Amino acid sequence: MNPRTSIRVHEAKKGESNMKQTAMLTTASLLTILLMTIHMTGDILFKMAPAGLINLLVIFIFVVQLYGTLLLAGRRAGYIIIFFGSAIGLLISVIHMKGTRGVLGGDIGTSGQAFLFVWTLLALGITATFSIILSARALLSLPWRRSRRASTAA
């Protein structure tokens, strides 16, 4: 086998892997956003979060994460936004798993919707953690500085 051909095949496989990771991260981040919105709906319905204008801030946070996921996919800024947005999603799960206002706090424990609420928290924790891992891997694999040759050649 020609050494040049094997290098090209290896580079193509590496590029395919990078595209698969980007697709996985995009999918996991979109699922995290979806589960966070479902969760926020439950929080409002179960009176664990206030209904009102404060939710405009929540909408803004979701829009920023959506922007980072879709429009900044594969870029450092997108990975950073996804990392912190997913950390918020994981934090939501952790907060609800502990304390007096946790999973069975408020009106949730006596509701027929308790299963969906708890399932959403578990799924949110899974997708958020997966998004954190993938975005951290992507950030660590990027070069942090451009070489002077690359910037002066342009």
Language model regions located:
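Loop-to-transmembrane helix junctions at the membrane interface
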Residues: 69-94
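Alpha-helical transmembrane segments in multipass membrane proteins, preferentially the mid-helix core
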Residues: 62-72, 134-135
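Cytosolic juxtamembrane helix and N-cap/initiation of the first transmembrane helix
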Residues: 7-32, 137-140
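A cytosolic-side transmembrane-helix exit/cap motif
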Residues: 72-75, 98-111
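C-terminal TM-helix exit segments that contain a strictly Trp-centered aromatic cap at the helix terminus
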Residues: 36-46, 87-103
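Individual transmembrane alpha-helices with interfacial aromatic-anchor signatures
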Residues: 110-128
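Loop-to-helix transition at the N-terminal end of transmembrane alpha-helices
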Residues: 48-63
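Cytosolic juxtamembrane helix at the C-terminal end of the final transmembrane segment
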Residues: 133-153
